[in-house]
Amino acid sequence: MEQTGPDVPERVGAMSGGWTAEQLEAISARGGDVLVAASAGTGKTAVLAERIIRRITDPIKPVDVDRLLVVTFTSAAAAEMRERIRLALAREISRRPESGHLQRQAALLGRACISTVHSFCLDLLRQHFYRIGLDPSFRVADETEAALIQTGALEEVFERRYAAEDNIFAALVDCYGGRHDDALLQELVLDAYKFARSTPWPEDWLDGLAEGFNLPGGASFDRTPWSAVLKQAAEIELAGARADLEAALRIAREPGGPQAYLANLEQEHDLVCRLLQSCRTNAPWAELYSYFKEVVFSPLKQCRKEDADLKLAGQARNFRESAKKKVMQVKSRYFSLPPEDLCADLRRMAPLIKELAGLVREFDATYRKAKAARGVVDFNDLEHYCLQVLAEKGPSGAVPSQVAHELQEKFVEVLVDEYQDINAVQETILQMVSRKGEGQSNLFMVGDVKQSIYRFRLAEPGLFLKKYASFSAGTGGGQGRRLALTANFRSRQGVVSAVNFIFKQIMTPAVGEMAYGSDAMLVYGADYPPVPEGQGNYEEAVELHLVERGPAGKDGGGDDPAGEEADGGVEAVEEIEEELEAGQKEARLVARRIKELLGGSPGGEHALEIYDRELKKYRPLTYRDVAVLLRATAGYANSFVEEFRREGIPAYAELSTGYFESTEVETVISLLKVIDNPRQDIPLAGVLRSPAVGLKAGDLARIRLASPRGDFYDAVVAASLAGQGELSERLADFLKKLEEWRTIARQGTLADLIWAVYRDTGYYDFTGCLPGGGQRQANLRALHDRARQFETTAFRGLFLFLRFIERLREGGRDFGAARLLSEKENVVRIMSIHKSKGLEFPVVFVAGLGRNFNFRNLNKAVLFHKDLGLGPQLVDAEARVTRPTAAKLALKHRLKMEALAEEMRILYVAMTRAQEKLILVGSARNLPGCARRWCGPAGTAGWALPDGFLAGAGTCLDWLMAALARHRDGAAIRELAACAEEPPAEVAADRSRWRVFFSDSRGRSAEMAEEPVLLAKVRRMEPLEPAGPLAGMIKARLEWSYPAIAVLGRPAKAAVTELKRRFDQLAAGEEQYGEGHFESFRLTAGRPLFMQEKRGLTAAEAGEALHLVMQHLDLTGSLDITAVRSQIEDMVWRELLTPEQAAAVPAEKIAAFFAGPLGRRLLAGFQVLRELPFTMAVQAAEIYPELVPYPGEAVLVQGVIDCLVDEGDGYLLLDYKTGKRPLGRPEEAARRYCGQLNIYARAVESILGRKVKEKYLYLFEPGLEIRCD
């Protein structure tokens, strides 16, 4: 029976019209600011759209749509909102066509303010540029152009400072510049600049940096902003130590427990409690320092075997050792220096901090001047310039300007979507354009702070939390009104319950920045119909798969929180290698599980049936229904793509690596370097050795012998003149081409140069013939496109392009390999959790949960925080000493806690993407050791896990497993850890259902309810029970044989043209095809040039040429015979056709087609799709009648549709026949080819989900149309 109670909300019920009471309240709330806290899957976008629609269609007090300001997070969301409003208006107008107001709203919609914040700012600046002295012709620089301008400005600033020989600047370089250059200091200046620009008044923030370090003599450290933060840090650690000691005391007091330890444990528990109380009551720092100075842990008394159970003694010792480690870490980290020394360190940093702030100001001015010279602004400028138009800085903050007052008067309401992701600058802008005052406030904000995952873009979830705390629930009062949407209409009960179970335990105010209370919990509202009997396997339980990582001798899974203290080096490399190995294992497991869910596992479960809301029925799972979500795709995603490819699973992933490392791109970039400057030995040798020139290693040696000294280019020139036969000729040809390319580089565009290189070397065509040729050519096309995009910026030329690429590579950035598949195809999507936000999928795998949190940024020399300012590392160059200042320790703690809260929210977003099935995958080393750590807080009273444990977690898996170890389905985890503590009854009896699986280092998987328990018994040398049902299952699997023997030998894939031939033979009564009777698909290679010159094109090649022309014709202009011939000539110029192919294409017959009824219908269509490939599975019995007894077998059919025309009420399907061979009467042609068209139509209706209303054959030779019914 499912549990209900105060912490477990009942299932929601829908109101009339499909809206719940919560949603209706959010739609209709008026009179004051409103904050809607909308949990995942609660329909917040629909609620926001309905609120807007009701405001503009209100019969009593309607509002014009252009008097609403609607702010969205993305342009796609803005377009979706505008379309929702358009459709709603169209429906209302159809019901009330006489309404002039509705007609007016439809006309105003195009100019309505529905956009992102940046788009709103851009529009405002276009109108009010003159108020801030902005050039009216300004444009927005893209990220590439802005980065190049920034680099130039920063180098200019540093050159000036070096020329001035400033001692303080020199000290700044010595302390923070790096070992060999000033690269780290340049990075520090950019970091400080970007952080300052995230605040409404950057100058004020920079001014405040040094103030906190100018401490007067005798100043108390307690008066600094960092003192309280460090006490909070100590408090969390000490609370964890207290919990460990309490667990040790419980074990020591058990029968058979190590009572000899009690005296030590009680004394140490009292000590930790006193320290904890001192931190909580904000005792003076000097007092705390004196307390910690006296802290010692005495050795434990000996515990003999006859006095206590040694197993219990070991557990108590482990808990006590953990507590000791925490306390001594607090002592050494925060209380190793007296407060006077802490203040002295801060005072020493003041001159350097002041110099850094001045450097940032100088860079800002130089960068602004450089942008003005080019007539550009960057994205940050849009917000700050907009703020200059809207606000003036007053004593207590921003004061609305005249423009702001005009906008306040204009906008009846300001509606903000994804409010949790805005920053302080955007918040100030919204405050300036919204009204204030009792009954006048008009700001409507929708968001979910649990899904605020853009802190790396300097979003501030604290803005949402502050309003949530200050606004009143229910009918209002105070500063505004707070509403909640909790009914989840996306996920099944099993997913909802699992999410609630985890986050009630891990999301606490201290670590998660908020409590996961009743207002935050999800309530099941999806109302899935029951699965019909016999329609596939369905399981409500959430799965968690544990993969054994690395050697079993090491402990892992989060002991070192993401390498927080690591410096990189060998440890970092080993960690990366281990994560890549874990990624491969997880990918293999996920691939196997996907095949099982699709019913592709012999002897395995049936295909999973999912509920299709559009079809309103259950259907089998397909690849496009599955998503694999990763915290970060770098490294891990490649493993999944490769493993899925190996298993035959189509997958799509937006990879951000692998582009610059691809051989074809490396080769072309080397050639571009040689064109820019041929006196570069390594690129030149690489180009000569590459297929673009094709020399051998021995040839390079002979070239060098031609001129042993000097540049290799001089040797190439000498060898080309040395008369060495073929080698000299090839080098002379290369040098001639090189001069031509250098001329193009000087006189033409970069894109023209790259395409000339492709054409002249034949390298583009060559790569297409290699394995993976399609991908290689896509990469080369992408290089051409990026060169073209680069020249749309203020930068031009080959040198700057190569410099830009070099900067990207030095910064570890990559474009990612060009993509051949689209995510809209029937593929498994592999994406980052950030990319998945706002999406939903029937089946979700969340993988990589054992990857360490990335805290490496916390080891930078200087840290920044919006409230705490700057935290520097103290560097004493003379004494060669470096240590963190108290400011840095405070910032490091605060930033780490904020990062943990962000990781928690990212996990929440990932788990709430699932509609029907959620599968979690993570890896860990030394599973029993990890289990002991996970079970440490198992006996904690109440729902929330201890803050000390949560803050010490190194991976999401630590959180998940510690929570699951307290569930009844996690009993095997506790047994594996030999955990004697029982979890609280209310937690253990939670309504959620879980299945935990363990996969060892060899990839063998078993449900953790069985194998880990047995493994633990073997390790404890305990006897095992008889084999039981497991032995029977193994025997059945080993003796299994494939039941559909008759299917073997039949082709699993066929082209449509082959099916036509088979249908013809079956219709003629010929004997059925046997094994090997099906013709295989053949690739027709182009004939050698000498054969083409003698013989011309075959009929098949001429037909291919005509199809190519029909595919590429521009349908927007005239298509008479003159226009058709002109387009064919253009295709020859563009190298889509050869001259021989063009001569074989009957232009007059194409013109006749377009002059006829079918051609006119094609031109009038809403959308025309040409040469559309497809792959479709059909029942094998449809092709092989003898396989009727095997209904589960399928054959893949693939083909290419010549033309598909969308006519609004359905598709018109066309198939061209171009041969000159007589086809007999129209009835004969229809009999031969209409079966082929029926398969095409079926594929279209199945894949695109729309009806094909008519099918036509068009025979070009006689110019005949034949309808296929």
From Swiss-Prot:
Native source species: Pelotomaculum thermopropionicum (strain DSM 13744 / JCM 10971 / SI)
GO molecular function: 3'-5' DNA helicase activity; 3'-5' exonuclease activity; ATP binding; ATP hydrolysis activity; double-stranded DNA binding
Function summary: The heterodimer acts as both an ATP-dependent DNA helicase and an ATP-dependent, dual-direction single-stranded exonuclease. Recognizes the chi site generating a DNA molecule suitable for the initiation of homologous recombination. The AddA nuclease domain is required for chi fragment generation; this subunit has the helicase and 3' -> 5' nuclease activities.
Source superkingdom: Bacteria
Residue numbers binding ATP: A38, S39, A40, G41, T42, G43, K44, T45
InterPro entries, A to Z: AddA, DNA_helicase_UvrD-like_C, DNA_helicase_UvrD/REP, P-loop_NTPase, PDDEXK-like_dom_sf, PDDEXK_AddAB-type, Restrct_endonuc-II-like, UvrD-like_ATP-bd
Cofactor: Mg(2+)
This protein's encoding gene: addA
Record's protein name: ATP-dependent helicase/nuclease subunit A
Pfam families: PDDEXK_1 (PF12705), UvrD-helicase (PF00580), UvrD_C (PF13361)
Family statement: Belongs to the helicase family. AddA subfamily.
GO biological process terms on file: double-strand break repair via homologous recombination
Catalysed conversion reaction: Couples ATP hydrolysis with the unwinding of duplex DNA by translocating in the 3'-5' direction; ATP + H2O = ADP + phosphate + H(+)
UvrD-like helicase ATP-binding domain sequence ranges: 17-492
Domain UvrD-like helicase C-terminal: 541-838
Cellular-component GO terms for this entry: cytosol; DNA helicase complex
Listed Gene3D superfamilies: 1.10.274.50, 3.90.320.10, P-loop containing nucleotide triphosphate hydrolases
Keywords carried by this UniProt record: ATP-binding, DNA damage, DNA repair, DNA-binding, Exonuclease, Helicase, Hydrolase, Isomerase, Nuclease, Nucleotide-binding
Catalytic activity, EC: 3.1.-.-, 5.6.2.4
Subunit structure: Heterodimer of AddA and AddB/RexB.
Signal peptide region: none
